[in-house]
């Protein structure tokens, strides 16, 4: 599963433009909220947000910056879940879920030292993930 496939699925679910009063995100296009679009340099009308700009935001904010692309090299299905969770709950939350799971599965540090609680996919996180992949 490639990042482009994952992004296409998100955009397919999220649809085009929305500004529903019950949605706390406010104006949204392609699943990208106005706040996220503005924080990433988009200045135009949200109804006109180009799809390719939304794709670039998804890749940068929810795949590359949190390091989920690194996870994908070892566990693509886990990376896909991190990507989806990161979009809905924030990349830091998704990373925290992964790290807590890795720590819960390491048999009281028998396989590796606990990974730290920082919201970063670092070398220790990848090593722990690889260790779990060898054990499965």
Task: Locate each region found by the language model.
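Cell-wall polysaccharide-cleaving catalytic domain and substrate-binding groove, primarily
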Residues: 1-136
